[in-house]
Amino acid sequence: MKILAIYTKGVGPLAEGEISLINDWTEEVESTVLLTGPNGCGKSTLLRAIAMLWDAAGYWLDQRKVLPPSHKARAWLQRWDGLAVVFDGIQPFYNHPVGLIVGKCDWVNELLQNHHEVTWLTGESTGNDNKRTLLNFDLDNEGFLNPWAESRKRLILTHDKVDAPNLIYLDAEERRWVAPKRNVSESLPDALAQRWLTKYQVSEDWQGQLEASLINLKTSQLHKYHEVIRNLNQFLSGKEIDPDIKPGESRLRVKLKGQRCVSHSLDELSAGEHQVLILIYLISRWMQNGGIVLIDEPDLYLHPSLIGSLLATIEQLVKERDGQLIITSHAVDVWHRYENQGKRIELKTRVEPQ
């Protein structure tokens, strides 16, 4: 699953129209995309918009009705006039362009008429009276959504291996490391809703903490646990995460190389090291085959010497799962990287009337 185009109207400062993710040379959907532009141009807004629309799609698949007022995606999406995301397919269910859409009725109808090549799966439109209507494109083909909907349920309700893509959204402002204060070291399960839409959520509770999830991974998938630890350790200088956990302690320790019996907790790592842990772990742990990874400023807090190797590791993780990576950055070195091996998109903003 890869995004091939995004359509916006009145979404933050973004200009109205199409944002194409098709490579200009190969005419294929690009698997690595960089969004650039000055502060306030809408880079972060666009990533959040995609994540919110995917979150809404989960509700539409489950309930087959409009989002309730209490749903966080509704509160955010209803601020804009229109948003549509077109994928090259959602394998193994749809092997042709499919789309999700939400917006004002007139804009939605115009977009549908202009893009008959897209199979629109579901969405919502809002009339002039502010009445919201579920766009049920399933009427002429009963059961068209059901296989995808059933796989989503298996994703969020079971630990089964499921052949269905997901979306990972890692917001820059949310990626703050907070030491746990409640229920520390308790054996608590991961929230399976992360298998549909993965986000990093700041919490002082042990449940949901990266460290707690990493320890759970050792119990459930030992081979992947050691693989993740190896990936993380390559970015730590003069130290390494000890994969062995002392019985009764249920905490991970970071050993200092060359110093016997000297260690500290994950909480004591630097801000840049925490960023590396968050990015690599969440992608390694939760990305489904064919998934999409959205990262707002992956170079945040990082020393310039680490940025290239971190991006290479993330790109490899996404490539191994046949997915798509979309990031934002202000770093010129990152711009050059994606101009040479990917697609860099300079976002356009609306021109306000004088």
Residue ranges and their predicted role:
Residues 303-304, 308, 337:
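Conserved D-loop-proximal element of ABC-family nucleotide-binding domains
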